[in-house]
Amino acid sequence: MLALEAAQLDGPHLSCLQYPEGVFYDLDSCKSFSYPDSDGGPDSTWGWTEAPPAPAIAAYEAFDPAATAAFAHTQAVQLCYGHGPSPSTYSPVGTLDPAPSLEASGPGLQVYPSEDFTSQTLGSLAYAPYPSPVLSEEEDILLDSPALEVSDSESDEALLAGSEGRGSEAGARKKLRLYQFLLELLLRGDMRECVWWVEPGAGVFQFSSKHKELLARRWGQQKGNRKRMTYQKLARALRNYAKTGEIRKVKRKLTYQFDSALLPAARRA
């Protein structure tokens, strides 16, 4: 019976003999399992009493923060937005309304309201009134009054009367009057295609219907008018001479007569 139990327990596993006094194990079959030591080598069964070899200590190296930072895990960074205009949202009507900012301003930061400086600047410039040019007194009078269309005799007489009291300069600036201009043309025989004598002894003369405008322009140049002189303006001045008596209208087309006092003694009838 004991031999059978011994045969069953014999093998690659541990074999033991049972005796009434106790259990005895076979030392050859009951070898302890080997575990790897700190160096990675198998632990020897018979080296239990020996002191394990001291592990090799690496030389001390200086701590390098840059090398450690290369292997450090990146952390999630929270993005901060400025206090500028917040993103816009569309209102139900279709207009673009700015969304209210949910961020509170930090300590020491001032939030200024956004203003449209471009529209304010352009708006004020676009509608700014331009200063009107300053006109002199002489230009003001010329703009308000018709240019040399009033009675030539009356206006010239007024100028002469006012200039006589100013001294010797008045005589040098004495203007040629219209009746004097026409009388000199007729006496010299200039511009015969424009004006001629009808009755020289009576002082009757006549204008040409074709070249009357040419004579009027010549008179405008003589006076130094800025605007173009026309025969209509010249005829208006001739009619005004009827008040002073230098020239009067004759019942004929484009025909006038000088006062006999203006004619030279040789031409008087």
From Swiss-Prot:
Gene3D superfamilies per the UniProt record, alphabetical: Winged helix-like DNA-binding domain superfamily/Winged helix DNA-binding domain (1.10.10.10)
InterPro entries with a match to the protein in the record: Ets_dom, ETS_fam, WH-like_DNA-bd_sf, WH_DNA-bd_sf
Location of the DNA-binding region in this protein: 176-259
Keywords: Activator, DNA-binding, Nucleus, Transcription, Transcription regulation
Entry's Gene Ontology BP terms: cell differentiation; immature B cell differentiation; macrophage differentiation; positive regulation of transcription by RNA polymerase II; regulation of DNA-templated transcription; regulation of transcription by RNA polymerase II
Region described as TAD2: spans on this chain: 42-63
A GO cellular component entry from the record: nucleus
GO MF annotations in UniProt: DNA-binding transcription activator activity, RNA polymerase II-specific; DNA-binding transcription factor activity; DNA-binding transcription factor activity, RNA polymerase II-specific; RNA polymerase II cis-regulatory region sequence-specific DNA binding; sequence-specific double-stranded DNA binding
Main subcellular localisation: nucleus
Compartments where found: Nucleus
Segments crossing the lipid bilayer: none
SUPFAM superfamilies per record: Winged helix' DNA-binding domain (SSF46785)
This protein's record includes keyword Transmembrane helix: no
Family designation: Belongs to the ETS family.
Name the record gives this protein: Transcription factor Spi-B
Species: Rattus norvegicus (Rat)
